Amino acid sequence: MSKKGKKAKVPLSDEEQLLLFQQKLLAEEEMAKKKERLLNQFLKDKLAKEEHNSALNLNKINTQWRTVLREIKTRELHKDIEILSQTFERVVDCKDSVIKSLAKDLSEAEEQHAHALRSHLHSIDQLLALQRCRLNLLEENYNMELEALTKEFETERKTIIDQHEKEIHYLQDVFMAMEQNYIDSEYESKLEFQSMWDDLKNKNLEEKHFLRLQLENIVEDLWRRFQDALKNYTDATEDRKIAFETLKVKDEKSSREIEAQMKKIQKLQDSIIIFKGKILVHSRESEEQNQDIREDKELVLVQLRKLKAQRTQARGIAQENLVKLTLESSATLKALREIVDKGEKILKLAEICRKFETEEEKVLPFYSSVLTPKEQEEIETMDLEEFNEELGKVIMDYKGMENFWKRYNKVKLEQLSLRHRRAQLLEINEKLREMLRQYLDGISVSDEVLSQLNPLFIVNHRSNLPQLLPMPTAQPGDKKPPATYNIIEAAHVVSHTL
């Protein structure tokens, strides 16, 4: 049992160690390949999962966006219906007022029928002509409003379609940006995987080179030992010439073994020389490959840095554009809300002011132009020639506001005329006040009236106007008589003198 244990503890030979080491290397390479396959499978599964999630998210975004667009369209249609209903009610009120005025005229004409038949018939003809004119005007106004509403509807429809197309393009751009980001991330992961693979390859080559150097050192050591043993053997044979005959058989046997070993050694030396040459060639090739790979790696890293810088710059620009777009959209929404509030306020004021409209304003809300059609055409052509195309388009877009500005200008003119009339009445009132004050001063007596010059005021048959002749001077010893005032109205004096 002890001999078997000693045999089990015998160390392995160099060839067995080399085979064991090669088996370990093969096992490690198989493990690395297996890990690489697992990593590739994991990345493929992750890629498929990301593509599936992106498709689901895109479908969700499209469905939510459709609901938002439907809500916006319904609100706009509700607003259009409200505006149309208000205009219809206003037209109906105008027609009701026209019918009331015509009924009133007809009743008056029937009352006067017994007195003047001819005048009645004449007035009936005038009323019919007036009615025809009014109906024509109403029809023209209705047609104009209908055309304006159709144009407004078409423009709103066009703007909505354009906005929808812009939003579709924006979503497509967002999708392309997401796809580009995904491609960039995939490319970065591929670069990282390639760099890791190159590092592992370089590491394996270095380990292989180190093992080859180690094996060469072992072979050289064995050769040196063999030479020493051979030298010792030759020395021993010289010292033991006496035992040559006895050991001749052993010598021949050993010589044959030595020759066999020498052949093996020669073969090993030849194989070592061949392996050294191959190692040198492979080392040179590996150095060149490593140099090329390092240069390619540097170029790839430089390009990667540039791409990362460009991506960060593009991301910053996109973020700035997004912030600017949100600010501008919020500002436009605020401005549109203010415009809508102003329009609602104007409509409310118009409804309030309709109570104070006269019959004439209800029948003919818009005054006709004093210009002839020819002059109107000349002015329109001249205005369009003066402005450029863009400004002309804007003016044509706001042409439907002419009736509004007509009523506005009419109100401003009436306001100015009322102010002018008020100033005239104030001036007349001041003049009347002055005349009344003078009249009251003439019929009343007070210290202020006595102190002022008044030709109508006479005391003791004398007025208080200054006399041309000088008054006699009084003596210093004389006493002034008490002042007595006899008041006589000027009208009484004039009646007696006449």
UniProtKB/Swiss-Prot annotation:
The gene is CCDC65. Belongs to the DRC2 family. Component of the nexin-dynein regulatory complex (N-DRC). Interacts with DRC1. GO terms for cellular component: axonemal dynein complex; axoneme; ciliary basal body; motile cilium. It comes from Bos taurus (Bovine). It comes from the Eukaryota. It is found in: Cytoplasm, Cytoskeleton, Flagellum basal body; Cell projection, Cilium, Flagellum; Cytoplasm, Cytoskeleton, Flagellum axoneme. Keywords: Cell projection, Cilium, Coiled coil, Cytoplasm, Cytoskeleton, Flagellum. Component of the nexin-dynein regulatory complex (N-DRC), a key regulator of ciliary/flagellar motility which maintains the alignment and integrity of the distal axoneme and regulates microtubule sliding in motile axonemes. Plays a critical role in the assembly of N-DRC and also stabilizes the assembly of multiple inner dynein arms and radial spokes. Coassembles with DRC1 to form a central scaffold needed for assembly of the N-DRC and its attachment to the outer doublet microtubules. Residues 98-160, 250-311, 417-441 form a coiled coil. This is Dynein regulatory complex subunit 2. One of its GO terms (biological process) is regulation of cilium movement. It holds the Pfam family NYD-SP28.
